[in-house]
Amino acid sequence: MRWMELVEDHRVFLVRLNPDLWTEIQEGALRSWDLLRPSRTERLPEFGFGDVLLLYHPELPDQPPPELSHVVAVRQELSSDTGYSLGPLFRMTPPIGRERMLFSSQQGSLPAVFRRADDRTYVLTLLTSEQRDQFLEYVLNAEITLEIEAGKGGATSAAPVGENPVIIEFEW
């Protein structure tokens, strides 16, 4: 599956399973990633084996309320420019819509991390530990079932989400 076919008009949240990423950032070894828009260059986002991508559909003027609707696991980076070998694409049933994403706001609005302006470039954003834990706890415990979407992805198993994941958002 090509990266552009996967993303379309979604925003992508990467659940990185390697907690050592925090140590790299704190030590200054990891400052930023060179993530350029694929339509401008041949460079692609750098995902690793076992990374879990959460696909979030932002609110658009002529579209229904936003939702977090799909989960896919990264198998490997391909040697060509086609992107990544991905596991099966799971549809979240039901999708997590606006009314189910009020877990961090008493005012009845979406969490700020979901409302940022889309500047049409890749950016790296690290959530705070509290945001990360709250977000993952909600997503994984919101009585959401995962169903394989026919014709998408590869094998029938997905990489499990780690106990201490790091979430990084890539805005498209």
What are these regions (language model features)?
Residues 43-61:
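Short coil-to-beta transition motif at edge beta-strands of beta-rich domains
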Residues 19-22, 60-61, 79:
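Short, solvent-exposed loop/turn segments at secondary-structure junctions
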Residues 65-144:
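Aromatic- and Lys/Arg-enriched surface recognition patch
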Residues 32, 38, 53, 57-59, ...:
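Sparse, context-dependent recognition of short Cys/His-centered cofactor- or disulfide-binding micro-motifs
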Residues 1-49, 126, 132-172:
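Compositionally biased, charged N-terminal/linker segments
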Residues 56, 61, 73, 83-99, ...:
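Charge-dense, helix-prone N-terminal extensions
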